[in-house]
Amino acid sequence: MNVNGKWYRAIWPNEHDPETVEIIDQRKLPHRFEIVGLTTVKKTIQAIRDMYVRGAPLIGATGAWGVYLAVVNMKDAENPLQYLKEECFKISNARPTAVNLEWAVKAMEAAILEKSNVEDWIKAAWSKAIEITEAEVKNCRQIGVHGSPLIEEISKNKNGKTVNILTHCNAGWLACVDHGTATAPIYAAFDKGIDVHVWVDETRPLNQGSRLTAWELGQHGVPHTIITDNAGGHLMQHGKVDMVIVGTDRTTHTGDVANKVGTYLKALAAKDNNVPFYVALPSSTIDWEMKNGVKDIPIENRDPDEVRKVWGLHDGHLVDVLVPPEESPALNVAFDVTPARLVTGLITERGLCKASEEGVRSLFPDKMK
């Protein structure tokens, strides 16, 4: 996508140094645009854990490139196979909720172990990492193709008046290599000339909505307004939201959706106000084994200081500011689970389906057990 008129993806191999993978340091956005080079597994894990990169599809792609870097750096390993398995385990456990990470690492490991020597391992790792990255880009593009008609239909029903879409957190190209999941239908509709406006939840505590979604929508020229996390229900009650589109970090094959904490409350408000609530996702985000999302999806708890402090630009410097009493504790639950019954539909690379086991099976019979 465009950044000040130049095309970028959220992760890419350095064109001059094949042993370096480059990412955008999303912690600094929107006030600083900085590119960071990853050269080791340790740096890759740090980038995932400390949220230089975030968003399920991008975490998966980053994990894939991390495995590639593990193979590149295994030249001095006494037992290459043991080394590979240990590094893959470390990468898989960098963050617990997004299923894409574990899926991508397993796919990388399987592709590598089909080969018999380290030199071929490097070639296989490079090819598979490229394949995984390009697949995510293609899938997100298709999500836009299948999701934009929903926006077009609302526009027709409103006689061309503005379609107001609410989204939570950042499920844009910054989270997905390119295009995004929740934003893919929005970009596709906007590029067709449909009058759209996006309500952007600020998404505390790290403000991925106000920092990232607002920034990338602005770069694309999409009209948007940042709102507090608790304003969505009020807007729905007064007819100012036509639809909700969010992303997901893990969705069970039965349709339960884990996404940034606060998503569940948006779904409840949408249900109460008859506002369609859609979840956009590539199939790499579907957990094909898990059935009960509320009970079984692992939910990450992050540093309480992310809740206690706010981050921003002050006098040209990026600073953290303590808000509550210093002695007050905080709980930082990073995700929640929206039950399938609250989801109007899933938007995937193969089309739309109900948020149910039968619905998912209708699009992905080859992946269901």
UniProtKB/Swiss-Prot annotation:
InterPro entries: IF-2B-related, IF-M1Pi, IF_2B-like_C, Initiation_fac_2B_a/b/d, M1Pi_N, NagB/RpiA_transferase-like. SUPFAM superfamilies: NagB/RpiA/CoA transferase-like. GO terms for biological process: L-methionine salvage from methylthioadenosine. It catalyses: 5-(methylsulfanyl)-alpha-D-ribose 1-phosphate = 5-(methylsulfanyl)-D-ribulose 1-phosphate. Pathway: Amino-acid biosynthesis; L-methionine biosynthesis via salvage pathway; L-methionine from S-methyl-5-thio-alpha-D-ribose 1-phosphate: step 1/6. It is an enzyme of class 5 (isomerase). Keywords: Amino-acid biosynthesis, Isomerase, Methionine biosynthesis. Coiled coil: none annotated. Substrate binds at R54, G55, A56, R95, Q208, N259, K260. One of its GO terms (molecular function) is S-methyl-5-thioribose-1-phosphate isomerase activity. It holds the Pfam family IF-2B. The active site is at D249 (proton donor). Its EC number is 5.3.1.23. Signal peptide: none annotated. The record marks C169 as: Transition state stabilizer. Belongs to the eIF-2B alpha/beta/delta subunits family. MtnA subfamily. Catalyzes the interconversion of methylthioribose-1-phosphate (MTR-1-P) into methylthioribulose-1-phosphate (MTRu-1-P). This is Methylthioribose-1-phosphate isomerase. It comes from Desulfatibacillum aliphaticivorans. The gene is mtnA.
